[in-house]
């Protein structure tokens, strides 16, 4: 009996967590922003997809189609005659997804097409961290309730219906009714898993050696920056490689280091200043790892979630300034996941509490009184 009661409470809590209805609907805004950012970045890097139609013969041995490309039998590389039609399809569905025209099919097709692009990059040894997460978020949006808010589809649906009762403001009509929160919560889970696994990878593969700050030193002291003098080897491997591990390239290369693309002399100097003091760089390394390992704070409500999302934005801002890797998509997603109406509602209460505390210190015997009454200091 006790087990059944506990099970019911647990299921009730899960049901309330994922399926409670809320008017906080950031999914429509996320649907508008992410396809625009994603399509812009793809156009910046590939324009009309011609860069996906060849393999560099000099690096041919480093190119291996990913498991998904093999499983689905997708073309690799993309055939030249398909490049422009694929590009047109990609940018058109991105626009439809952002506008909310054929919203759910457009999001689904755009998400799958982005995964295909990510997989081509992975096959060439480059993992696109931004697009890999965003493509998953797009697929969630394609089925989650609330993602059609602020869309052309919703506007056309509203205009086609005969209004009954008092008319609502247009923005409220476009926002739509309260919807279950499971889509929003699922995106939070994806984001939490992304940050958490990043922290686990640092501990698993780097251990204490990562926490000593030497990896960050390599990134920030100019060793990985093409804008500073000297050679910048990007592919790395252990000093003593067993012969059986040299099968792919003859060297046993197993990973590569990130490049620091920051060309600003000012931010280069800031990076040098940080790395010049071992304590600073160690604090940065430890703080970043602990922050990522605490990612499941995103599943909590209230200030823990808000503070973590703000911390994530700050972390990406720092990486953007120091390495010119701003992860704009992540920053936008974190910003839009914050319930700013809740934050605004909480801040005045905090300010009032602070004022009351200060008043008690300044005026002995001060007591707050209800609104409409006369304040009395005894």
PLM region spans:
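Alpha-helical membrane-anchoring segments
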Residues: 1-378
């Amino acid at each position: 009996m006790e087990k059944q009661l506990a099970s019911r409470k647990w299921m009730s809590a899960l049901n309330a967590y994922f399926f409670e209805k809320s008017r906080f609907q950031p999914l429509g805004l996320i649907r508008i922003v992410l396809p625009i950012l994603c399509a812009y970045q793809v156009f910046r890097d590939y324009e009309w997809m011609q860069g996906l139609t060849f393999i560099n013969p000099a690096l041919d041995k480093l190119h291996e189609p990913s498991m998904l490309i093999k499983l689905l039998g997708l073309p690799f590389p993309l055939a030249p005659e398909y490049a422009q039609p694929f590009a047109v399809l990609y940018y058109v569905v991105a626009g439809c997804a952002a506008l909310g025209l054929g919203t759910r099919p457009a999001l689904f097709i755009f998400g799958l097409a982005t995964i295909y692009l990510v997989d081509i990059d992975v096959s060439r040894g480059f993992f696109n961290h931004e697009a890999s997460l965003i493509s998953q978020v797009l697929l969630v949006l394609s089925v989650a309730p609330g993602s059609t808010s602020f869309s052309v589809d919703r506007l056309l649906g509203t205009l086609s219906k005969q209004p009954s009762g008092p008319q609502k403001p247009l923005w409220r009509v476009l926002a739509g009714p309260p919807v279950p929160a499971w889509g929003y919560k699922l995106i939070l889970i994806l984001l939490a898993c992304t940050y958490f696994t990043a922290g686990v990878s640092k501990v698993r593969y780097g251990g204490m050696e990562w926490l000593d700050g030497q990896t960050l030193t390599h990134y920030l002291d100019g060793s990985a920056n093409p804008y500073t003098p000297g050679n910048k080897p990007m592919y790395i491997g252990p000093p003593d490689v067993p012969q059986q591990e040299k099968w792919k390239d003859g060297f046993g290369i197993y990973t590569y280091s990130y490049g620091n693309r920051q060309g600003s002399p000012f931010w280069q100097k800031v990076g040098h200043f940080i790395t010049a003091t071992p304590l600073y760089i160690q604090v940065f390394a430890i703080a970043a790892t602990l922050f990522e390992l605490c990612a499941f704070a995103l599943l909590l409500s209230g200030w823990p979630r808000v503070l973590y999302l703000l911390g994530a934005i700050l972390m990406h801002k720092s990486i953007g300034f120091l390495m010119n890797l701003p992860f704009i998509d992540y920053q936008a997603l974190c910003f839009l996941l914050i319930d700013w109406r809740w934050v605004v509602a909480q801040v005045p209460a905090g300010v009032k509490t602070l004022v009351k505390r200060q008043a008690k210190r300044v005026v002995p015997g001060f007591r707050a009184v209800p609104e409409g009454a006369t304040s009395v200091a005894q």
